[in-house]
Amino acid sequence: YKADRLLSGGTGKVKGVTIHNTNDLKNVEEDAEQYTRATWPNANMNDARVHYYVDDVNAWQNLREDEVGWHAGDGRKATGGNETTLSIEIIMDGSGSKEDLKAEENGVLLAALLLKKHGLSVNELYTHNHWMGHPDSIVQGARKNCPLYILPHWAQFKQKVAAKLTELNGGATTTEAGKTEIMGKAKASAQQMALFARSK
């Protein structure tokens, strides 16, 4: 990770959103805050850098949205996940608890908000597996499967993001290159936008 490097060859253009899972912290209420503090200022995450951590309570931003992260396992490949996409770590434990489900729901919302903000469609929503050359499913014997808890139902997760994106577009369907089939008024509640309220 090198600070202040801009996405997409220095243009800062966001070309997608990559979804990850990281483990829930035991006996911690706001995991996203703790992961952020482990990154800044404690430097306990080594070179790993993601744009957002999201839990069942809120989201914390770790990098500017035009900045290159270090999360996709594909190095400095010009067309890869590190160099072109925003990253979201959804904090879960795979238990199916109400906290787990809420964290995933918040991840759906954040992904949709970011896709909308940057004029992207659900076709630009990726798994970590995608950038490592794996299918969007659990791969036996793989070095890593990520997002571990979402991969088994990735298609449904993606459908939820698509539905939320359509809702944010006022009922319009976002297509390639950020175009909409029918223009509608974008709406987001105060509760939805509150996910962005806490950042480093």
Feature-to-residue mapping (PLM):
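Short, solvent-exposed alpha-helical surface patches in non-cytosolic proteins
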Residues: A177-K200
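Secondary-structure junction/capping motif
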Residues: N27-D31, T127, N145, Q191-A194, ...
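Basic/polar, cationic surfaces and motifs that engage anionic cell-wall
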Residues: K2-T11, L86, I91-E181
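Short linear sequence motifs
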Residues: V28, M45, A142, P147-I150, ...
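Alpha-helical and His/Cys-centered functional microenvironments
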Residues: D24, M132, F196
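Active-site-adjacent loop/helix surface patches within enzyme catalytic domains
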Residues: Y1-S121
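Residue-identity detector for glutamine
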Residues: Q34, Q61, Q140, Q156-Q159, ...
